[in-house]
């Protein structure tokens, strides 16, 4: 019996050593040696064949073998578990990595940057200002006094009697001219707010305001700058026209239309069969605005223009619903 026990222990030692750090295989080996129907249990069953006088000694040998086997497998399982976990945590730096998905700029951000790039190229500097604006800068300094009918044209978010969420980026015209002397050539991109929400309007939208002031600035300069912008943004083959309009802070004023990008000027549902689409408003700075900032309208002239970035983006990419920009739908955003 002692020889059988010795062989059993030697076999267990060798097989555990051969399996090294394979915890699952060691667990299976433990069942084979220590399980209810295992090798050691078979030897215990043979105790009945051992002479009664020898049974105490044989029983002691078998119990010692059981303790030794339990210790052997416990140590092997602990070692195998630790080293197996270590292997799982190791990183093979020679294996090619998985490239994470790249983010993209929102289409409005892309177009806003493109607009700024074009005007930077034309020599315009970017200026910024507060979105929560004083009524004075948003209206009065732009030739829109409290009793002016033009105030009815804009649905305004009022923070208090004299503070509003700016309805346009035009206040940057006044703020810039208050701080600087001509010549001035700036654009002011930013968010604006109005109480309006439908397929073509949202309560928050983006605008870019432009201002150029100096000696002998003419409407011809305005037309030249905006013609270059349109051709850079939409292509050199896109026609444009200047249509008389009204804005309280410019005189004369004009809307700028481009040939419909959908039908190439032939007439379609998007352009209401006219072949033209409005993209921005513009005009020569009203002398009264110059006086509000301390400029002499007899010495300087200038022009201003303003455009909605959402409008430009919709025309550039053929988008027919403004609300798509704010729904965070990956199916839409991944196209840009």
Curated annotation (Swiss-Prot):
Q: Where in the cell is it found?
A: Cytoplasm
User: Which cofactors, if any, are listed as required?
Assistant: Mg(2+)
The UniProt note on the cofactor reads as follows: Binds 2 magnesium ions per tetramer.
| EC category name | ligase
Q: Which residues cross the membrane?
A: none
Which SUPFAM superfamilies does the record associate with it? Class II aaRS and biotin synthetases (SSF55681), tRNA-binding arm (SSF46589)
| Entry keywords, A to Z | Aminoacyl-tRNA synthetase, ATP-binding, Cytoplasm, Ligase, Magnesium, Metal-binding, Nucleotide-binding, Protein biosynthesis
Q: Which InterPro entries match?
A: aa-tRNA-synth_II, aa-tRNA-synth_II/BPL/LPL, Phe-tRNA-synth_IIc_asu, Phe-tRNA_ligase_II_N, Phe_tRNA_ligase_alpha1_bac, Phenylalanyl-tRNA_Synthase, tRNA-bd_arm
Q: According to the lineage, what is the superkingdom? A: Bacteria
Q: Name the Enzyme Commission number(s) assigned to this protein.
A: 6.1.1.20
Q: Which Gene3D superfamilies match?
A: Bira Bifunctional Protein, Domain 2
Per its UniProt record, what CDD domains does this chain match? PheRS_alpha_core (cd00496)
Please provide an example of a Pfam family that matches this protein in its UniProt record.
Answer: Phe_tRNA-synt_N
| Catalytically driven reaction(s) | tRNA(Phe) + L-phenylalanine + ATP = L-phenylalanyl-tRNA(Phe) + AMP + diphosphate + H(+)
GO biological process terms, alphabetically, are: phenylalanyl-tRNA aminoacylation
GO terms, molecular function: ATP binding; magnesium ion binding; phenylalanine-tRNA ligase activity; tRNA binding
Q: Where does Mg(2+) bind?
A: 251
Gene Ontology CC terms: cytoplasm
The principal localisation class reads cytoplasm
**How does the record describe its quaternary structure?**
Tetramer of two alpha and two beta subunits.
Name the protein family.
Answer: Belongs to the class-II aminoacyl-tRNA synthetase family. Phe-tRNA synthetase alpha subunit type 1 subfamily.
Q: What is this protein called?
A: Phenylalanine--tRNA ligase alpha subunit
Provenance organism: Syntrophobacter fumaroxidans (strain DSM 10017 / MPOB)
Question: Which lineage do the record's taxonomy fields give for this organism?
Answer: Bacteria, Pseudomonadati, Thermodesulfobacteriota, Syntrophobacteria, Syntrophobacterales
Gene (UniProt): pheS
